[in-house]
UniProtKB/Swiss-Prot annotation:
Residues 1-31, 46-192, 265-339, 357-464, 481-656, 691-735 are annotated as: Disordered. The keyword Phosphoprotein applies. Keywords: Cytoplasm, Phosphoprotein. It comes from Schizosaccharomyces pombe (strain 972 / ATCC 24843) (Fission yeast). This is Uncharacterized protein C1604.12. The modification Phosphothreonine is found at T597.
Length: 860
């Protein structure tokens, strides 16, 4: 076992320990607030728990550096700071079982001879060093290197600060760290962890780390629980003290499983020294056995009530160490069974190792309960019935010992080790519940078997459950348990019966679902048929419109144009929708699609129907973008395809309304831009840069009048988007009779050579072909040449603000750059939109600098 470093915390005089509020060990011991380890060390160690400590080498003890001497001794480990240790007078008549061996603790300043009994008391000799002295004045100074008084005792903070205790333990958990529970001492401990071994003398000093105490115990032969409590000195000082590491002997005596469990539990507990834990475990097991064998209470002076509740102390320590998972997962016995009172002896089960013969007994009980509890069937019922009994027994068993013992049963021992060794551990001998223990032993295999076979058939389960209650009755556990088993069995049978009903219900449910599905299919089929009928009606209506439009084409009316547009759009739609519609799954849909193909030119857009939208992902057919064309009213395909007029497909008003809403929004934007464009293009001068067009023959018809552009197709480079405007929009234009023949042409040239985009209902297709010429536009903010627009296009991120980069063109200029593309519309980037647009995520600081500085404007 690694020896505690010389700079171990020194148990200081009580005067020094005053630094912490309930510094006196008595106050500490009074309540579990004090780390149970230190208290238990002091108290439990009193009764020969120090046995075998007497022979511990002085070095070991000195490493503990228990300065029993009440005068504050500054341990070098304490960095010369004399921690004030609460003078703890342990009124534990510590039988000098190992008194013969007085250990001189070399607190670097004070070499105190600590009688092994004093050591047992908490490794703290009476200041007088009388091992036999019933009262031990524990003045623990944990020399945490710097933790002067704070290291007084891990327990020093224990009175009210379990966290501090735990943290002190954690610090002390490093063998070098001094386990002072006080936060200050914790900090100091952390600083001095390596300098000062954790002296869980806290039992005596109420601050010794459990591992420290374990190490010290291994030296002194005193066994300390994880809390540093003296579990028990070995019966003979020689047993522990015979070797500086009596733990080896203890190990031999200790159950291997116990050692393993102790080591396992100790390891999870914050960095507890495995060797220390093992030795402590050995000692603990030895001591526990010794207690059970001797049946002698550790010290009559130590009233269990005064002992810190190991449960609370451990809980606090676990809390501070984040050990709750360990507690809950590994064993709640850690709390409940911490103090094992066998034969009236007070045994503190190491919270860390949690492997103690008495604990094991409870663990076995718990384990028996636990396996049964997991099985939710009759076994589970048995488990609850059994669990209360062992708990009660344990409570009764220990209730005489301490109230804390009663509180201990709180853990259900869910994870208590169920090892047969622990079950049969002789130390378990507990007169209070031999029958229960025997029953558990007998029952355990059965319970585990049932637990293993939770999936057995109901009959088997019923049999097992019935057998289990029978066995319980034999064992005479509790009639209630047997009754509960019978009740459980009845429930199981009922469940079995109910299972059939449940299956019936399930089948019925499935049947209902199938029927509902069929009904849904039928309903869908009916809907599709209705859609097909409505499509047919729309088709007929479209044919009528087609006929009427063909008749009206001769008349120069916007209506004719609209009808021709509708016709062309229908034709295009038929072309586009024929293929996707054929994909529709419903036979009606296929039929309608076939019909659509038959009536291609006049077929209404199937896309407008919800079914078609479901059938294919492109409800709106692709739009043909044709270069500006000579107005040929008879060539409808030159027109941009248009969605049906609401009149053409009245049955699809809803879907059309969706399209129209979108298009109307686009149209509104587009129209506003056109108006602005017209206002900006206030004359031929402004438009002189536009691609050359034949002057409008009817230039005087109206400012925006349609001009005759026959034979003058605009070059595709300057072909402007042909977007379909709303009918109301087209009516806003003054149409000369001369240009009525041009109505089929969507793009109408104004007398000013500006292009007016007349749009009937339909998608707004905006193809902006920037002319190769460099027109100037007089914008509200700035006159911007088109050549400048290239940089602007490159600087799109400037004009498109992303959520990440708000737009800032220039502090003086609001973001209002209106670019009038020649002849088509003004592109007005007037909106600080934060939607992610092109290159939205791209940010060029230099570019932004240029922009902000207005360098790009300088180009103008």
């Amino acid at each position: 076992m690694e020896r505690i470093q010389e700079n171990d915390p020194i148990i200081k005089s009580a005067d020094e320990s005053k630094e912490s509020p309930a510094e006196t060990l008595s106050s500490i011991f009074k309540r579990p607030k004090i780390k149970s380890s230190s208290l238990n060390k002091a108290y439990l160690g009193k009764a020969g728990s120090v046995n075998g400590a007497s022979n511990t080498s002085t070095n070991q003890i000195s490493s503990l550096k228990v300065d029993v001497s009440s005068p504050p001794s500054t341990a070098p480990g304490s960095a010369g700071s004399t921690p004030k240790t609460t003078p703890v007078s342990l009124n534990a008549g510590v039988p000098p079982s190992n008194t013969g061996a007085n250990i001189t603790t070399n607190s670097n300043n004070n070499a105190q001879t600590i009688s092994s009994s004093s050591q047992s008391v908490g490794h703290i000799d009476n200041p007088s060093g009388l091992g036999t002295h019933g009262k031990v004045r524990l003045s623990i100074k944990l020399s945490t290197g710097g933790s002067g008084g704070s290291s007084v005792t891990g327990k020093r903070t224990a009175p009210g600060n379990p966290w501090a205790i735990r943290s002190a333990e954690r610090l002390a958990s490093n063998p070098t760290s001094i386990g002072t529970s006080s936060p200050e001492s914790i900090d100091n401990n952390s600083n001095n962890k390596k300098s000062a071994p954790s002296l869980y003398a806290a039992a005596a000093a109420s601050a010794a780390r459990h591992s420290m105490s374990a190490a010290y115990a291994s030296f002194t032969g005193t066994v300390y629980d994880s809390n540093g409590n003296v579990i028990k000195g070995l019966d003979t000082s020689s047993s522990l003290s015979s070797s500086s590491h009596p733990s080896h002997e203890a190990l031999s005596t200790i159950d291997t499983k116990n050692l393993q469990a102790l080591a396992a539990s100790a390891a999870p507990s914050s960095c507890r020294q495995q060797p220390v834990d093992e030795e402590r475990q050995d000692r603990v097991s030895k001591i526990s056995k010794h207690f059970q064998d001797s049946g002698t209470p550790v010290s009559e002076e130590v009233s269990p009530t005064r002992l810190p509740s190991p449960t609370s102390a451990r809980r606090a320590s676990h809390l501070s160490e984040g050990k709750w998972d360990e507690i809950d997962d590994e064993d709640d016995d850690d709390w409940g069974s911490t103090i094992e009172f066998e034969d009236g002896t007070t045994v503190v089960i190491d919270a860390k190792t949690r492997r103690y013969e008495p604990v094991k007994r409870q663990d076995t009980l718990a384990s028996n309960h636990v396996p049964s509890a997991p099985s939710n069937e009759s076994v589970s019922s048995a488990a609850p019935s059994k669990i209360p009994v062992p708990e009660e027994a344990s409570i009764n068993e220990h209730s005489n010992i301490t109230d804390e013992a009663v509180s201990l049963p709180e853990p259900v021992y869910p994870n208590a080790p169920t090892s047969a060794v622990s079950v049969h551990n002789p130390t378990i001998s507990d007169e209070a519940e031999p029958t229960e223990r025997a029953f558990l032993k007998k029952e355990k295999p059965q319970i585990s078997k049932e637990k293993k076979n939770p999936n057995v058939t109901h009959e088997e389960f019923v049999e097992k459950s019935t057998a289990l209650p029978r066995h319980i009755n034999k064992v005479e556990i509790v009639s209630d348990s047997s009754e509960s088993f019978a009740h459980k069995n009845n429930e199981k049978r009922f469940d079995k019966e109910a299972s059939g009903r449940i299956n019936d219900l399930r089948a019925e449910q499935q049947q209902i679902m199938l029927e509902a599905r069929q009904k849904a299919i039928e309903r869908r089929r009916n809907e599709e048929e209705e859609l097909a009928r409505s499509r047919e009606r729309a088709r007929k209506k479209a044919e009528e419109i087609k006929i009427s439009s063909s008749k009206m084409n001769s008349s120069p009316t916007i209506t004719n144009e609209r009808s021709s547009n509708v016709e062309s759009s229908k034709k295009v739609e038929a072309i586009y929708t024929k293929e996707p519609q054929s994909i529709t799954n419903s036979p009606e849909g296929l039929h309608s699609n076939q019909e659509t193909t038959e009536i291609d030119p006049s077929s209404p857009r199937d896309d407008s129907t919800p079914l078609s939208w479901r059938s294919h992902s492109h409800p709106i057919p692709p739009v043909q973008v044709s270069p500006l064309f000579t107005s040929d009213k008879n060539d409808p395909l030159q027109l941009n395809p248009q969605s049906d007029d609401s009149t053409s497909s009245p049955k699809h008003g809803k879907s059309r309304s969706i399209d129209e809403v979108i298009l109307s929004i686009k149209d509104v934007i587009f129209d506003n831009n056109l108006y602005k464009q017209r206002s900006y293009q206030s004359g031929v001068a402004a438009n002189a840069h536009l691609p050359h067009r034949v002057p409008n023959e009817h230039g005087g018809v109206s400012r925006i009048g349609n001009s005759n552009a026959l034979g003058q197709p605009v070059s595709s480079s300057s072909s402007y988007s042909h977007s379909k405007g709303r009918d109301t929009r087209s009516s806003s234009y003054v149409v000369s009779s001369e240009t009525s023949s041009l109505k089929s042409s969507r793009l109408i040239l104004s007398h000013a050579n500006s292009v007016r985009i007349q749009r009937s209902k339909g998608d707004v297709i905006l193809n902006l072909h920037l002319p190769k010429v460099n027109p100037e536009r007089f914008l509200p903010t700035k006159s911007l040449k088109l050549e400048e627009m290239k940089p602007l296009e490159e600087k799109v991120p400037i004009y498109r603000s992303s959520s990440k980069q708000p737009l800032r063109i220039h502090p003086t200029h609001p973001l209002r750059v209106t670019v009038c593309l020649p002849g088509s519309k003004t592109i007005q980037v007037a909106r600080r939109s934060f939607r992610n647009s092109m290159n939205a995520n791209r940010y060029d600081p230099q570019r932004r600098e240029r922009i902000d500085s207005g360098l790009w404007r300088a180009k103008n």
